[in-house]
Amino acid sequence: MDTRNVIAAISLSAAVIILYSLFFQPDPATIKKNLAEQNKIENNEDTPSLDKNENFSKLSRADALKENDRIQFENGSVVGSISLKGAAIDDLTFKEYNIELNRNEKITLLSPRNVEDGYLIESGFVSTNKNIDIPDASTVWEVSGNNKLTNNNPVKLTWSNTQGITFEKHISLDDQFLFTVKEKIINSSDKSYNFYSYGQIIRNELPEISGFYILHEGFLSVLDDELIEEDYDDIQDKKFTQIAQDGFVAISDKFWVTSVIPPKGKEFKTTFDYKNKFRANYISTKGIEVKANSSIEEKIQIIVAAKRVNVIDGYAENLNINKFDLAIDWGFMYFITKPLFFVLDYFFKLLGNYGLAIIAVTICIRLAFFPLANFSFKSMGKMKLLAPEMARLKELHKDDKMKLQQAMMALYKKEKVNPMSGCLPILVQIPVFFALYKVLFVTIEMRHMPFYGWIHDLSDRDPTSLFNVFGLIPWDPPSFLLIGAWPIIMGITMWIQQKLNPTPPDPIQAKIFMFFPVFLTVILAPFPAGLVIYWSFNNIFTMIQQYIVQRKMTIKTT
């Protein structure tokens, strides 16, 4: 990559982002209208509240799991249990994912509500009728029949109040991450009652988050085709509420998602809030009347999943969950990022290694931009051939910058050379570069995937460091000194590439460009190793192409 073109292209990209934010922000009238609608929804007294006074003494996770009777569940992807007290899904571990690369300890996502970092899902009914007993977090349910939940064996929970009403939960589990809960009310009394169905995700504490601006971690919903993303700190300041008829409610981590999907075609109110714990929930806005000696049933779906692309896309399609694929944060360049993942995944299946797949994608990108790059290199080759004449003009007009600039422009016009022509191929490639960064950062498929040699995780930084001679000295340098072998390889290839480009006439500019490979080496050191490998091989392929083009031009001129 021509360093000057990289700087120019990045500047142009920044300008586009700034202009977009200036001209496409919602107007104040729209914001005011949305706030008015928000207040109207929040002050709606027709829908019962999910606020409850719950006081639980905090226990260790092990003790909390022993405190109440539980139904165990297991399939090929998850293992855990459902507490009979409250009937919440509050214990779930992913069987296929380790916490760290070389440790066998598995990722545990859900924990009981009386654990410090409790994280759980609950569902059921509430009512505006204060005289009726309804199951809550303290209710102890009874198991009817099978007492272990698997993908082949559903379970049934029941609880009856003293007013002649029985509540049932029929829970099933597929072979991956989907729980289906059929909530049933059987009214054996001589009175009619109204109930509102709900689903709720509760998280006691702020989790450890990545903190990168390119990744959303927090509250997530698609409501009537609108994507809603709210950060934890925003919800701590002000709750979010919106009414919709279609969508899902979720809390999203980098690689995991916990979501509840309301019944189809029924209006519901979604709320994100914080009252000593984070809550994401929905509640139906219209009561369901259960007449005397009758019954009703509502079905909700709960997905607690690792964000594997084929799994998330499969649920989105098979369950008809609108835009559920956005549970993976593909970003605003969705139209590039997601297809790029599929290309990478294709080469992975073909070559058996994501590092090799990245190199294959690099070659494909070079081939796709070959005509643009050729045009750029020919222009730079002409610039290099004009270097002696440019040096002569510089010496001739060294005391008059205006005349020097005019002479240079006349030379460019005469020789039909555009010094900025190299910008276009670089500018086109910048979205691809950021899209690849996004893919490496957010897709669980890249997690703990090795390359050859010392790279054991392409989604993480190069673990080696120049400052301990790549592990030869028994010293662990601080993170800001972790400049690994691949970032250095990238810097060297960029420096060699610079030598193929014409030297800038301005000595200060020349020094800046000479320092740029060192600067970029330091900047890219903490980036995912896969991205640095991409940039390194892109430099190598660019140098080869540039050398061939310039050699042909030299032969033609001699």
Swiss-Prot record:
Superkingdom in the source lineage: Bacteria
What assembly does the database describe for this protein?
Interacts with the Sec translocase complex via SecD. Specifically interacts with transmembrane segments of nascent integral membrane proteins during membrane integration.
Q: Where are the transmembrane segments?
A: 6-26, 326-348, 355-377, 424-444, 469-489, 512-532
The topology of this chain with respect to the membrane is: Multi-pass membrane protein
InterPro entries from the UniProt entry: Membr_insert_YidC (IPR019998), Membr_insert_YidC_N (IPR028053), YidC/ALB3/OXA1/COX18 (IPR001708), YidC/Oxa/ALB_C (IPR028055), YidC_ALB_C (IPR047196), YidC_periplasmic_sf (IPR038221)
Q: Does the keyword Zinc apply?
A: no
Q: List the disulfide bonds.
A: none
**What taxonomic ancestry is recorded?**
Bacteria, Pseudomonadati, Pseudomonadota, Alphaproteobacteria, Candidatus Pelagibacterales
The gene that this protein is the product of is yidC
Where is this gene product found? Answer: Cell inner membrane
Question: Which terms are listed as keywords in the entry?
Answer: Cell inner membrane, Cell membrane, Chaperone, Membrane, Protein transport, Transmembrane, Transmembrane helix, Transport
Q: Which GO terms describe its cellular component?
A: plasma membrane
Recorded GO molecular functions are: membrane insertase activity
The family assignment reads: Belongs to the OXA1/ALB3/YidC family. Type 1 subfamily.
Which PANTHER family does the record cross-reference, listed alphabetically?
CYTOCHROME C OXIDASE ASSEMBLY PROTEIN COX18, MITOCHONDRIAL, OXA1
GO biological process terms, alphabetically, are:
protein insertion into membrane; protein transport
Protein name stated in the entry: Membrane protein insertase YidC
What role does it play?
Answer: Required for the insertion and/or proper folding and/or complex formation of integral membrane proteins into the membrane. Involved in integration of membrane proteins that insert both dependently and independently of the Sec translocase complex, as well as at least some lipoproteins. Aids folding of multispanning membrane proteins.
Source organism per entry reads Pelagibacter ubique (strain HTCC1062)
